[in-house]
Structure formats: structure tokens, C-alpha cells
């Protein structure tokens, strides 16, 4: 199996699908984690978006491009909301909605009236830079003191993803690519490969966020139980004396 763009795309799709399945299994056990529900839905939407890329050879390209990018935008918004929910920070609905709407509108403009693969890739890269930077900023700015380790590690992963897409903004698209993303050239291939590794790292970062949050909750519950026993101990001793 040669390591070309279509092969790596298939591997990336299988990876995203496996991560989505794994988070779904976690959700069966950790049903009380609202952020996990949002992240799981986001990962399934990401896998659906990549499915639309794989089907472009069998179905009309223009509707699939619009559908895939709309689903991708919704996936990013849910991931963003999941981070805000994990940090217990309010996030006005209109802010990510405006960002996602502007992204989808840009894709529609450069796939229907003015088809241009290079501009579409730049629009997608700019959207990814903004969303990942937003999540990294929230994790650094609003990290609870007892959860800073996992929040800062996750922020580093999101920041690395933002850097990759920022670099992609300046990379050229192969002149003979036309409207085919699989022929975009070696520089785009390199950023896609880096994105696969960062997607795996993001999966572990999200799990670390959940684990540290549960550890903090367990320590808090243990302290509460200890205080409760300490308060009850004198009355219990008096009852023994009686």
C-alpha cells in the first residue's frame, strides 16, 4: 500500500470513525458528562464529513462539498460547545453560529459561482485556525486551578492544530489540481498527515480532560464525606457514653 493522498485519507477516515466509536462506548459508562455527549456528536459528524469526501467519485461533487463542509462546521461548533460546557463557561449561541455560517457561505461562493479549490482550502484553514485558537484560549483562560494540567495540555494540542492550518494558508495548491482535493499537491498532503496525528492527540487530550475532572470530583466527594463523618463523630461518641 503506497502512502499517497487517497490512502492517507482512508486511514484518516478510519481513525476518526474508530475515535467516534470509542467515545460512544465511553458515553455508555459516563452518561453524566455533558461535555462528552457534545464531543461524541462532534466526532461522529467529523466522520460523516470525511465520508462525503470519499463519496465524491460516486455522487455529484458540488452538493457533497457543500454538505460535507456544513457538517464539518457543525462538528467544530459542537466541539467548541463541549469545551465551554466542560469549563462551565457560558457561550452565546450566536457567536459560533455566525462563524460557522460565514464559513459555509464562503464554501458555497467558491464552489458554485466561483469554483476555486485553493480559495476553499484557505477558507477551511482560516475557519480551523479561528475555532482551534478559540478553544485553546478558553482552556488557558478559564482552566480551573485543580484541572490546569489537562486543560493546558489540551490547549497545546488545539494550538498545534491552529498552527498547522495557519501554515496551510500559505501553501500553494498544485496547478493541475483542478477541483480535486486529492491532487492538491505534496504540501497539502503533509498538512493532512500532520492533522491525522493531531486528531489522535486531541482524542487523548479530551480523555485527559474527563479523567482529571472526575478525579477532582472524587477528591471533593471524599473531603465532603470526611467532614460529614467528623461532624457526626461527637454525637456518636455521646450516644456510646449514654
Predicted stretch roles:
Residues 1, 182-183:
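Juxtamembrane membrane-water interface segments that cap and precede transmembrane helices
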Amino acid at each position: 500500500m503506497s502512502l499517497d493522498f487517497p490512502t492517507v485519507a482512508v486511514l484518516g477516515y478510519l481513525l476518526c470513525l474508530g475515535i467516534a466509536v470509542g467515545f460512544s462506548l465511553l458515553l455508555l459508562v459516563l452518561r453524566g458528562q455533558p461535555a462528552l455527549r457534545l464531543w461524541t456528536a462532534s466526532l461522529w459528524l467529523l466522520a460523516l464529513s470525511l465520508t462525503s469526501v470519499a463519496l465524491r467519485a460516486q455522487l455529484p461533487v458540488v452538493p457533497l462539498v457543500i454538505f460535507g463542509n456544513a457538517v464539518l462546521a457543525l462538528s467544530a461548533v459542537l466541539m467548541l460547545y463541549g469545551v465551554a460546557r466542560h469549563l462551565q463557561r457560558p457561550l452565546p449561541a450566536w457567536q459560533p453560529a455566525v462563524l460557522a455560517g460565514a464559513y459555509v457561505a464562503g464554501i458555497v461562493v467558491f464552489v458554485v459561482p466561483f469554483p476555486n479549490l485553493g480559495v476553499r482550502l484557505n477558507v477551511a484553514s482560516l475557519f480551523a485556525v479561528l475555532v482551534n485558537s478559540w478553544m485553546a484560549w478558553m482552556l488557558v483562560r478559564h482552566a480551573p486551578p485543580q484541572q490546569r494540567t489537562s486543560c493546558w495540555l489540551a490547549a497545546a494540542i488545539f494550538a498545534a492544530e491552529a498552527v498547522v492550518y495557519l501554515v496551510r494558508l500559505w501553501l500553494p495548491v498544485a496547478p493541475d489540481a483542478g477541483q480535486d482535493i486529492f491532487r492538491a499537491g505534496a504540501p497539502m498532503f503533509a498538512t493532512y498527515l500532520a492533522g491525522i496525528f493531531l486528531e489522535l492527540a486531541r482524542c487523548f487530550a479530551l480523555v485527559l480532560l474527563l479523567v482529571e475532572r472526575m478525579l477532582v470530583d472524587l477528591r471533593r466527594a471524599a473531603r465532603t464525606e470526611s467532614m460529614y463523618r467528623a461532624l457526626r463523630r461527637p454525637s456518636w461518641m455521646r450516644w456510646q457514653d449514654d
